[in-house]
Amino acid sequence: MKKLEICVPATTANLGPGFDCLGLALDIFNVAVVSWREGVRLTPDQLYEWAKKQPFEQQAIAAAYSYYASQQTVDLPLIDIDFTCDIPIARGLGSSATCAIAGLMAGQYIHQGSCDKEELLKLTTDLEGHPDNAAPAILGGLVLSAGNETGPVTVNLPCHENIHTFLMIPDFELSTGEARAVLPEFIPHREAVKQLAAFGFLLQGLARGSHDLLRQGNLDFLHEPYRRQLLPEYDTIKKRLLDCGCSVVSLSGAGPTILGLFAGSADEADQLAPLIVRELPSGWELKRVQINHSGLRQFCF
């Protein structure tokens, strides 16, 4: 029996004004160990039916595996999936993207014997509908991405070692569909101009590790003014994080997790955590998480 271990990091997307195009990989992982035997292989249609019968916690990985078979028009063996989920589900930390990547990676490796990250990113984007979580999860670090008719386009951007991340994770879920439903179709032109400026300041602040530049980038008109109504405690938590010294506070992806970016030394970041939790609303957990620079990792044994 052959085995493949696939480690996929969590991601935080948007980072405020980088709506649907900016993402950052984090050192929290979902790990899938996939086992299979060579021999009998199933058609894509058979794999699709098999995937629907898998346990809930493995179903997304199995579905992505069958999707790979259908997209490549190949027969693949059945797989056993041992899944360790350390990324909170439906919290805006890219958990669905990790499952899609794991299933597609399994199919790609069994089919080709290697990992082609460019192809993997295209397939994941096709399956997920957008690359803002998939790109940093696969490539690691801070990634700017966009989708076009030929597939996703990405670029890794510099992120200073003085940038530290804090996650405020609630004990409730928020579906991406619900968060998308509250967004307007249009925003005023003057707000779009301010958004562009904030995005530029955000990128420069991340590259230079500058608190002042990041504060200028702590602005969004595309999603947070509308999604905050789904989180009654958002304003309270955002004020707390800013008062404690965070440079940027934003929803992580579609929420409900709230991201705080701090520009300073590691010692200063260590001192920040006790201040934040001192007046934390009930039902919220603080996690200080390192930035992940390696992205997707796989081991065959």
Language model features with spans:
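Alpha/beta catalytic cores of group-transfer enzymes, especially the acyltransferase/condensing modules
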Residues: 115-162, 249, 255
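Acyltransferase
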Residues: 162-239, 243-244
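Short beta-strand-to-turn element immediately C-terminal to the catalytic PLP-Schiff-base lysine
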Residues: 34-35, 137-139, 143-148, 259-263, ...
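Solvent-exposed alpha-helices and their adjacent loops that cap or buttress functional pockets
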Residues: 12-14, 23-26, 73-74, 127-128, ...
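DPxDG-like acidic metal-binding loop motif
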Residues: 28, 93-115, 138-143
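Glycine-rich, charge-dense phosphate/pyrophosphate-binding loop(s)
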Residues: 206-301
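Glycine-rich beta-alpha junction loops
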Residues: 28, 38, 141, 169-174, ...
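ATP-binding N-lobe of GHMP and related small-molecule kinases
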Residues: 1-91, 109-115, 291-294, 301
